[in-house]
Amino acid sequence: MTTRSRVHGFSLYRSGLVFLLCLPYFFLEGGCTKQDPYVPPDLFYYFASYKVGKNPTTVTPIDVNQDGVTDLVTTNMSSNTLSTLIGNGDGTFRDQVQLHVCQEPRSLATGMYNQDLYPDIVLACSGGDEIAVLFGRADGKFIEGPQYPVHRTPIAIASDDLNGDHIADLVVALRNDKLKIFLGLGNGEFRHGAQYEYGDTPTSVALSDLNADGKMDLVVTNGGPMSNAVSIWIGNGDGTFRQPTDYRSGKRPLGVSFGDFNNDRIRDLLVINGERDSFSTFLGNGNGTFQAGRDSGADAGPNYGLVRDFNGDHRADVAIVNIQSSDLSILFGKGDGTFEYPPRNYRTKPGPFSVALYRVMTKEMEEPGLVTVDNGNGTISIFLHRGLKPSASSKPAASS
């Protein structure tokens, strides 16, 4: 018998076996049916868009006036501005207030840097090769604080207490393969800390305690062609870090977020890969190390993602914005670091660059809202959970 006939023979044998296995169910259950294809739940709906500055890159939920309601701030690179939108608490926001800031503000960090009652902001100013501090006020506006030069093109910034003095510090990623530490003084000023040269084109930074020792650790995505990795820097608790450990990611990793994908109460990583339309999950071991990454498919041009249980099944899901296909993808987790496919996609305005989660509160419940920053449209767009139905009178006119 030839190889081809053996293959066909196996196929016929397998078909007969399936028929024999199915035969009892045919008489008892009325026949054998194919498993229905997976259909992702439709949990969100587009609600409204709001104008911000030109080419916005980040949106950050923050209660700027401390009234218990989430507000939003965006960095707008091409207009050199910061937009503040005061929240009404029902998923809607007032019109933006713009503040002219530094050259090409690309990303921001928030904290109580001068230890008053109102949150402050530090901007990574790519066009000015500096970071700029803004102090919050009771009316929700910001005033300029000190600026600190950095060597070249700050790309990303993160903030937490790095040296155990209960004062917020900063980590800044620079385009020339450097990481710069700034240690807070508690009065809104900073002093220069350690500087590290490592990796290839850092694209994002994030801080968390990854080994449960009470000290902040650092995660950096390196998007250059010589790296394509996520680097784990274990903190020493004094504002310095040990030599990093690299984990291979997909091509051109752009952003990293934390979550718990397998419900073991250990921090895992979500890494968005800008090329080849994928994202990677890394399951944590609890000691600052991670298992090898698992790649999953995304839509065209994923740019940023976040982690949250959106459907209440106690399994972490992810929301990803895709800048080329101009949509928001929700992928529902299986509880092991993998995800159901296909995702639920929602059309966005052109060029969604980032996404953030914010609280929407009603008298009956609290639900997650999602906000995308639309780089190609100069807007932010609100997507509300279907458990929330604000009245038609509260819905603002959508911006084009």
Explain the meaning of each model-derived region.
Residues M1-L12:
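N-terminal secretory signal peptides that target proteins for export/translocation
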Residues T57-Q66, I86, R106-Q115, F135, ...:
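Beta-propeller blade termini
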Residues S15-E29:
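Bacterial N-terminal signal peptides
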Residues L72-T75, I121-A124, L170-A173, L218-N222, ...:
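Hydrophobic beta-strand segments that make up the repeating blades of beta-propeller
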Residues F353-S399:
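Blade-level signature of beta-propeller repeat domains, shared across WD40, Kelch, NHL, RCC1
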